[in-house]
Amino acid sequence: MATPPQRIVSLTPHLTELLFDIGAGDRVVATDDASDFPPEVAPLPRVANYRSINLEALLAQNPDLVVAWRSAQSRMLAPVEKLGIPVFYSEPTDFASLADEMRSLGRLLGTLQKADQQADAYLARLDALTQRYGKPKPVSVFYQLWYPPLTSVNDSTWPGRAIKLCGGRNIMADANTPYPQVGLEQVIKANPGLILAGSRDPAVLAHWRQWSMLDAVKQQRLVLINPDELHRFTPRALNAVEQLCEAIEQAGTIKSR
């Protein structure tokens, strides 16, 4: 692009947040229904949700760049690309690759110095967490993504990678799909020492208390993780990763006694 874009429409929460992180937040003119951080996004027009894009509302913003999540939104944006509007697609594959995306956005938007600073700080913290918590621990972990139906994650997902980074063993690590539906008997057989859920509501884990034979229940290791931090591809994810690592480390301390 000859000049850095000045009117950006962001269609996914993690990109909205990254734009502010790298110093381009003042150019965001519209976003999606789920973007709620930082607080400055509150008054912005909303032109999409996780299922669809309001093309008319998007075009009304006269954007010179649209940023989107490739795996979830590329098909929906075909009409936008046909109109010649540039689209930046995000698809971080692991924690380290997020820094590359920050730099790519910074290069595109003319804020590379700020993006480099943020990416370097993020990688330094990621390395510190890996050094502190990365040693494998004798802790089996079940991550409850949703209930009901009982749904978990394999190791290719953001939460799955976090469990691995923290040295835990995800009991659904090798599932054939990223977000497998799980039978209760599978969890009981695996007998995890820690059960996690991406939620702020303690009620989402209450159903486990009836299964008192589970190590996680015996040890009161039913832990909530902030979903807006862990499930979004941003530097804030490391706040949740650190919380997750602490939970695994504490469970490992009990296990090794």
Language-model features and meaning:
Residues 12, 70, 145, 175, ...:
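Short secondary-structure boundary segments
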